[in-house]
């Protein structure tokens, strides 16, 4: 059995202040005996309109996170960072950036996932509408990170609404799905817990949903409720409190194998043509 931690934060626009919180959560996770900690979307800097400015620091921020993983000998799913270049090193010519989730081992970065599904929606909150595609270029590749405790399928926030991605990750060998997120208060209240459990049930993977919670400036409010669901789709734990919090949950690969053998969903799937 392995212990895995899921973080909840209220990140603001002060990178150094956020890093103090990040390190404290790593310390707490390590004290809990966890092998992995998952951070939420925008965990290093949460502010609209500064994507390019933060993206310019991508490599230095990555190095700082690698140093934390090495210092504390823990795996880190580094929420998301804005990045000015694609995985092949090419720069986006239109001024947009990529939303990148890194999986970092104590020895360094092991995988990079660029968020595929962008949040272009109308929400009945103070902000009203969101159009991530104005500022971000979507990724195209499905990514698995191999770890000593199982294969991690990397997802980000809005990706949770698309079961095809979770099922593709499962078909490529994922045991765990990570979903660093910053759900709006409105959409989170409606669907967050449901999505964690639904994607776990669909894929028979353990789902770890790290979350932003609270106010970020005067208009942006996030739902929080960082949580985890097991390979049956049952809720393992969810944070009900506000602000910075951490949960640590068990993951048993042997038990997951038994669940999948007893209900072999992937073998039973039939993609019908209508």
Where are these regions (language model features)?
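Active-site-proximal beta-strand elements of phosphoester/diester hydrolases
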Residues: 1-13, 38, 112, 144, ...
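Cys-nucleophile CN-hydrolase/nitrilase-fold catalytic domain and related Cys-dependent amidase chemistry
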Residues: 15, 24-106, 112-114, 184-205
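Short, acidic/polar
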Residues: 17-27, 161-167
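CN hydrolase (nitrilase-like) catalytic-core segments centered on the catalytic cysteine
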Residues: 58-78, 151, 160-244
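Short beta-strand scaffold segments in enzyme catalytic cores
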Residues: 78-79, 99-103, 143-145, 226-228, ...
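Active-site catalytic loop in hydrolytic enzyme cores
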Residues: 90-172, 185-187, 194, 261-265
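Residue-level detector of high-confidence beta-strand sites
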Residues: 100, 112-115, 179, 238-240, ...
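A short C-terminal boundary segment appended to hydrolase-like catalytic domains
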Residues: 254-274
């Amino acid at each position: 059995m392995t212990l895995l931690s899921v973080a909840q934060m209220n990140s603001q626009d002060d990178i150094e202040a956020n890093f103090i919180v990040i390190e404290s959560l790593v310390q707490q996770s390590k004290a809990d005996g966890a092998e992995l900690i998952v951070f939420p979307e925008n965990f290093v800097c949460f502010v609209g309109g500064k994507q390019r400015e933060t993206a310019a620091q991508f490599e230095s921020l990555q190095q700082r996170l690698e140093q934390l993983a090495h210092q504390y000998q823990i795996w880190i799913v580094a929420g998301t960072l804005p990045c000015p270049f694609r995985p092949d090193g090419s720069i986006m010519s239109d001024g947009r950036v990529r939303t990148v989730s890194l999986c970092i081992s104590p020895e360094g970065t092991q995988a990079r996932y660029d968020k595929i599904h962008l949040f272009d929606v109308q929400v009945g909150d103070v902000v009203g509408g969101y159009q991530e595609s104005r500022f971000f270029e979507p990724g195209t590749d499905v990514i698995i990170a191999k770890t000593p405790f199982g294969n991690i399928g990397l997802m980000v926030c809005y990706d949770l609404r698309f079961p095809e991605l979770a099922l593709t990750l499962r078909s490529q060998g994922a045991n765990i799905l990570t979903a660093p997120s910053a759900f709006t208060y409105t959409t989170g209240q409606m669907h967050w817990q449901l999505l964690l459990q639904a994607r776990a049930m669909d894929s028979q993977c353990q789902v770890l949903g790290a979350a932003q919670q609270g106010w970020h400036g005067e208009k942006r409010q996030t739902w929080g409720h960082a949580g985890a669901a097991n390979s049956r789709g049952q809720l393992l734990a969810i944070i009900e409190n506000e602000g910075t919090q951490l949960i640590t949950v068990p993951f048993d690969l042997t038990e997951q194998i038994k669940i999948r053998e007893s209900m072999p969903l992937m073998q039973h799937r039939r993609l019908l043509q209508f």
